[in-house]
């Protein structure tokens, strides 16, 4: 049992925690309006936007604001809303530029927009399965592009392009099947581009032969931390009067028992992390993505 009454139980011989540090604060992400190709029904692009809203909410790392909610910004600029593969990048960039100052003034860290830039529909032969022989069907392919801007740093988030495909005997089912494949990919997008930072609270007792293998970080369910999440560990080092960060190791979350603390296995840099922590040198943990390829 790791947790009791919201507090971490430390075994004897464990390293003493560094000075108390505040919990990470949830920053606000505004999921703004989405555009579409003229061949795409409006209900489809709203379904995509709702998946993005749900993915951010389910990840649990940010405060989420709906750009279409009452009290948010007025509607889009005149003539905005339709894109194609050739124009989507410039249209999205211009849209973000027009909206980001107002979003920043309202306290947002990020603004996210998107578009269904292309839609293709074709007849295909569906493969045979255990119940039915090969038969005619339909294939729907959507090109979805997500664009975002980091308002704090003043830089764009790299665009993410998804090709969503679905096959089904009925045309509308092919559309729905294709669109439904987006949600499962969005956690990787969020983890890659919308990171947060936290601190190491304490080292776990050292193994007599292997040294320090585990530690505790100051983030739990409140920040959406779950087993399997990864963190990179950096040491902050002054260079010529400027604070720089040097990578010293990597963590994988093994156990999350409350809202503020998680136990992690050190997967890289055991000695470096332990030495820096015990010496009181500044260490920062930055959330990382589990995706190897994307």
Where are these regions (language model features)?
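Bacterial N-terminal signal peptides
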Residues: 1-11
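A structural "domain/chain start" motif
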Residues: 13-79, 163, 196-214, 287-294
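C-terminal/domain-edge helix-coil "capping" segments
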Residues: 18-26, 151-227, 232, 256-294
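Soluble periplasmic/extracytoplasmic beta-strand elements of cell-envelope proteins
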Residues: 28-33, 51, 55, 111-117, ...
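N-terminal segment of the mature soluble domain
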Residues: 31, 39-115, 156-159, 225-229, ...
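Soluble non-cytosolic domains of exported or imported proteins
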Residues: 38-50, 90-93, 139, 143, ...
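Amphipathic beta-strand/beta-sheet edge segments enriched in Tyr/Trp
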Residues: 109-166, 257
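Nucleotide-binding motor/catalytic cores of P-loop/tubulin-like NTPases across gene-expression machines
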Residues: 238-262
């Amino acid at each position: 049992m790791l947790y009791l009454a919201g507090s971490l139980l430390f075994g004897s011989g464990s390293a003493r925690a560094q000075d108390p540090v505040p919990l990470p604060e949830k920053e606000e992400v505004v999921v703004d309006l989405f555009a579409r190709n003229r061949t795409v029904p409006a209900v489809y692009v709203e379904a995509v936007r709702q998946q993005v809203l749900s993915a951010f909410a389910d990840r649990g790392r940010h405060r989420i604001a709906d750009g279409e909610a009452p009290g948010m910004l007025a509607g889009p600029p005149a003539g905005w809303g339709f894109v194609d593969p050739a124009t989507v990048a410039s249209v999205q960039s211009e849209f973000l530029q027009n909206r980001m100052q107002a979003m920043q003034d309202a306290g947002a860290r990020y603004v996210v927009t998107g578009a269904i830039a292309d839609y293709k529909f074709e007849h295909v032969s569906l493969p045979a399965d255990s119940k039915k022989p090969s038969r005619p069907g339909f294939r729907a392919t959507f090109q979805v592009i997500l664009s975002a801007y980091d308002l704090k740093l003043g830089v764009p988030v790299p665009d993410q392009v998804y090709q969503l495909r679905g096959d089904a005997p009925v045309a509308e089912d092919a559309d729905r099947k294709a669109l439904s494949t987006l949600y499962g990919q969005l956690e990787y997008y969020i983890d890659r581009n919308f990171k947060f930072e936290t601190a190491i609270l304490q080292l776990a007792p050292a193994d007599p032969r292997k040294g320090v293998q585990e530690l505790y970080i100051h983030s739990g369910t409140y920040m959406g931390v779950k087993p399997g999440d990864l963190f990179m560990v950096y040491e902050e080092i002054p260079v010529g009067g400027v604070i720089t960060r040097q990578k010293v190791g990597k963590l994988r979350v093994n156990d999350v028992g409350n809202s503020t603390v998680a136990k992690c296995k050190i997967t890289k840099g055991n000695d470096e992390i332990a030495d820096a922590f015990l010496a009181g040198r500044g260490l920062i943990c930055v959330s990382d993505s589990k995706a190897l390829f994307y």
